[in-house]
Curated annotation (Swiss-Prot):
Positions annotated to bind Mg(2+): D159, N188
Protein name: 1-deoxy-D-xylulose-5-phosphate synthase
Gene: dxs
EC number of the protein: 2.2.1.7
Pfam families for the chain: DXP_synthase_N, Transket_pyr, Transketolase_C
Residues engaged in binding thiamine diphosphate: H87, G128, H129, S130, G160, A161, N188, F295, E377
Family membership noted in the UniProt record: Belongs to the transketolase family. DXPS subfamily.
Pathway listed: Metabolic intermediate biosynthesis; 1-deoxy-D-xylulose 5-phosphate biosynthesis; 1-deoxy-D-xylulose 5-phosphate from D-glyceraldehyde 3-phosphate and pyruvate: step 1/1
Organism: Pseudomonas syringae pv. syringae (strain B728a)
Listed NCBIfam families: dxs, PRK05444.2-2
Swiss-Prot/TrEMBL catalytic activity: D-glyceraldehyde 3-phosphate + pyruvate + H(+) = 1-deoxy-D-xylulose 5-phosphate + CO2
């Protein structure tokens, strides 16, 4: 097995067993003695395929044996297998007929980064966001029972995803309806229990066996006739299990808890899954795996190797280093440290996005003012509200797509009370290869309808810093949305002074057409404006809108064009049209933004072209409208 990136194969490895097991039907024709070798081949294939395309890396390496065991024991796709989030689903995709297409992973019209129902019958539920698997599998189990089917429903969820309240809502509900389902906890950093070994594996086999289950039920019938005897027996059993297993919480919720067992021990996995397959009621299996298993760098640094970029051929010439602009997240990371130095009231909150939101430096410099709440967006927002009530100044660093999960709290707990909370909304707009589940397509639409909300869209790195200060120093809730990646390399001023709220700025004076740019599409607007001699306005604020500037543009131009990387429906352009209607200003308005579809995964530039938001598409749309209005 490779131990360095140089050793990862650049050509498809020889995998005779995997060649025979590229579907679960082929897998089940293999003998159990061959599965260990198959695991080695699948791990090598995963290293090769992700090296060709880039993608999520460590999680898949950690579930090789579990994936094989699940498809070997259960009758997929008839039995429903639901993967939480989907980062770990690449081995599943390879084993379910998509091996030949893995070279298209995360590319336009290629294999998706996450399980998709439209992609394969083995992808029984589309995922991307965390902690949905148990609810989905429970719904499938209930529906199957109502239909008279005996198919099995299995949810595989990681220990990180189990921090979200939604997962526990489902865990609480399933025993109430006596659902025949299996939840597998993939504990890949041993955060819940370290109690793994031969004795624990042996106990799991016994406790999951049909013989033990029958004996337990028989004893219950006999002892229940003797006053107090069954209660004593039950407590003795719990005490004996409690010395070896950490499942008291799940048992109290009504689950039959088995484990923890070694998630890389194929014989134990297969034996335990076979036993649990035949048990009735809600079953819970705790397996412990190692993220990045089999590839030393990923085992040592599972966070750093959560995902990797495409590997270049070994003989490729060294690429010249480019002087790159700072990432927008990096600008935020520097700003929050600077503002924290200036204001001791500042606290930073994130739902498990420290690295992605660039809060590492802040967490190290201000550990007592940094709060990572794990995958708990609802809690993050209301936690910020509580802090604001007591005079702190919370900054919630969150991805646009994940803020959707805390929307009620944003309205009910923050906005209704007009609390001073700044939302630094990263990954706004299209995000590229991760596709529609991770796109920030809707934040302008769902934020601008909230009374009292300050909503801002910077056009470059310097404006981001200024608008963050503006939102932070504002009284009431505020949001600054910014995209993934880098900007145009603007000169960033050190000042923490705010901008005047609700005021845009004219970046280019032209005639005939006025382009009202909301956000980073300003750069494309300026390119188009040079060809059309158009006026370009950097609007900066979606709410409050610079109504005076819009009125002036309407009075002096034949056509107004609104430009945003947000859904056209309800977005910034809609705010412009709503104002014009209220002011009784009749003007032709062209709205350019994201169409009313889910934009599929591709490179960001390809997605913008598809949506008509590159310079060529913007120019074509404007010319088409000008032709219509004569």
């Amino acid at each position: 097995m490779p131990t360095t990136f140089k050793e990862i194969p650049r050509e498809r490895p020889v995998t005779p067993l995997l060649d025979r097991a590229d579907t679960p039907h082929g897998l089940r024709r293999l003998g159990e003695a061959e599965l260990e070798t198959l695991a080695d081949e699948l791990r090598l294939e995963l290293l090769y395929s992700v090296g060709q395309t880039g993608g999520h890396f460590g999680a898949g390496l950690g579930v090789i044996e579990l994936t094989i065991a699940l498809h070997y024991v259960f009758d997929t796709p008839d039995d429903r297998l639901v993967w939480d989030v989907g980062h770990q689903a690449y081995p599943h995709k390879i084993l379910t007929g998509r091996r030949a297409r893995m070279s298209t992973l995360r590319q336009k019209e290629g294999v998706a980064a996450f399980p998709r129902r439209s992609e394969s019958e083995y992808d029984t539920f589309g995922v991307g966001h965390s902690s949905t698997s148990i609810s989905a599998a429970l719904g499938m189990a209930i529906a199957s029972r109502l239909q008279g089917s005996e198919r099995k429903s299995i949810a595989v969820i990681g220990d990180g995803a189990l921090t979200a309240g939604m997962a526990f809502e489902a865990l609480n509900h399933a025993p109430e309806v006596a659902a025949d389902m299996l939840v597998i906890l993939n504990d890949n950093d041993m955060s819940i229990s370290r109690n793994v070994g031969g004795l624990s594996n042996y106990l799991a086999k016994i406790l999951s066996s049909r013989t033990y289950s029958s004996m337990r039920e028989g004893s219950k019938k006999v002892l229940s006739r003797l006053p107090g005897a069954w209660e004593i027996a039950r407590r003795t059993e719990e005490y004996a299990k409690g010395m070896l297993v950490p499942g008291t919480l799940f048992e109290e919720l009504g689950w039959n808890y088995i484990g923890p067992i070694d998630g890389h021990d194929l014989p134990t996995l297969i034996a335990t899954l076979r036993n649990m397959r035949d048990l009735k009621g809600p079953q819970f299996l705790h397996v412990v795996t190692k993220k990045g298993k089999g590839f030393a760098p990923a085992e040592v640094d599972p966070i750093g190797y959560h995902a990797i970029t495409k590997l270049e051929p070994l003989n490729a010439p060294a690429a010249q280093k480019k002087i790159s602009a700072p990432k927008y997240s990096g600008v935020f990371g520097q700003w929050i440290c600077d503002m924290a130095d200036a204001d001791a009231r500042l606290v930073g909150i994130t739902p498990a996005m420290k690295e992605g939101s660039d809060l590492v430096a802040f967490s190290e410099r201000f550990p007592e003012r940094y709060f990572d709440v794990a995958i708990a967006e609802q809690h993050a927002v209301t936690l910020a509200a509580g802090m604001a009530c007591e005079g702190s100044k919370p900054v919630v660093a969150i991805y646009s797509t994940f803020l959707q999960r805390g929307y009620d709290q944003l309205i009910h707990d923050v906005a209704v009370q007009n609390l001073d909370v700044l939302f630094a909304i990263d990954r706004a707009g299209l995000v590229g290869e991760d596709g529609p589940t991770h796109a920030g397509s809707f934040d302008l639409s769902y934020l601008r309808c909230i009374p009292g909300m300050l909503v801002m869209t910077p056009s470059d790195e310097n404006e981001l810093r200024k608008l963050l200060s503006t939102g932070y120093l504002h009284t009431g809730p505020a949001a600054v949305r910014y995209p993934r990646g880098t900007g145009p390399n603007a000169v960033i001023e050190a000042s923490l002074d705010p901008l005047e709220i609700g005021k845009g700025v004219v970046r280019r004076q032209g005639q005939g057409v006025a382009i009202l740019a909301f956000g980073v599409q300003l750069a494309e607007a300026l390119v188009v404006a040079e060809k059309l001699d158009a006026t370009v306005i950097d609007m900066r604020f979606v709410k409050p809108l610079d109504e005076a500037l819009v009125s002036e543009a309407a009075a002096n131009h034949e056509l107004l064009v609104t430009l945003e990387e947000n859904a056209v429906m309800g977005g910034a352009g809609a705010a412009v049209s709503e104002f014009l209607a209220r002011a009784n200003i009749l003007k032709s308005v062209l709205h350019l933004g994201l169409p009313d579809v889910y934009v599929e995964h591709a490179k960001p530039a390809q997605m913008l072209t598809e949506c008509g938001l590159d310079a060529q598409g913007i120019e074509a749309a404007i010319n088409e409208r000008l032709a219509l209005i004569g």
